[in-house]
A protein has these predicted regions:
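Charge-rich, well-structured scaffold segments of protease-associated domains
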Residues: 1-65, 82-109, 115, 121-226
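Membrane-proximal cytosolic interface modules of multi-pass membrane proteins
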Residues: 77-80
């Protein structure tokens, strides 16, 4: 409802629930003083609502931002969603939780590993899935900017009823690589490419925005070192 929309906006979009970044060659003390005078030291609508709730004997937590809790991994055997599209547009996905947003090394390592396994038609796991004739193409994506980073593997132009078979082929291919190893040259090439990208930070946006987004990917989840 409209009232729920207003309530959600008041809970989350206010200075007490904000993250502020400063970037560039500026007078930090002057910038902070300006922010404090204009915004941070002034009672916000959210704080006034909270004070009114306390004065009325109400539970102030009902006006606080909604909590974001870590969820236990869920093993979903099979979930099907019907969509109004042609069969050629069918997608089958496989998602894997990588850990915590605070474990950046693990997330970067997982991104490198999945690039080695699925990043090209010659990548061993992608090659195995395509050879099985389950669909037209395989793409993977590492979602690192969340509380629980995850890897999403998607099979495009999927054949009917192959969801469980996709999981089996994926797991068998990974099991084989655990026994025989991932080609060292491939891993070294991907590590070098990732190192270059991380150093260059060429994301097509302003440097300050890129750095702020990178910091927020863990700062939002209580990483004081961000």
């Amino acid at each position: 409802t409209y009232e729920q929309f207003l309530d959600t906006h008041a809970r989350h979009y206010n200075p007490s629930n904000s993250y502020i970044t400063l970037y560039g060659d500026l007078d930090v003390d002057r910038a902070l003083a300006f922010l404090d005078e204009r915004y941070l030291s002034q009672p916000s609508a959210a704080s006034r609502r909270m004070d009114a709730a306390v004065a009325a004997g109400e539970d102030p937590s009902t006006l606080a931002p909604n909590p974001l809790d870590v969820q236990a991994p869920v093993t979903c055997e099979y979930k099907r969603i019907e969509m109004a599209t042609t069969p050629e547009n069918a997608l089958v996905g496989l998602g894997l939780v990588l850990g915590s947003a605070l474990d950046r090394k693990r997330t970067i390592a997982a991104d490198i590993l999945f690039e080695a396994l699925l990043g090209s038609n010659e990548a061993p796991v992608k090659k195995a899935i395509l050879a099985a004739g389950l669909g037209g193409n395989v793409v993977s994506y590492t979602a690192a900017e969340s509380m629980q980073p995850y890897e999403l593997i998607m099979l495009q132009n999927a054949q009917p009823g192959i969801a469980r078979e996709l999981r089996r082929v994926f797991q068998d291919a990974c099991r084989d690589l655990c026994e025989h190893g991932v080609p060292r040259e491939r891993l070294e090439a991907i590590i070098s490419s990732n190192e270059y990208d991380l150093r260059q930070r060429d994301y097509g946006i302003a440097d300050g925005v890129a750095i702020a987004c990178d910091a927020l990917s863990t700062w939002l989840y209580d990483d004081d070192a961000a």
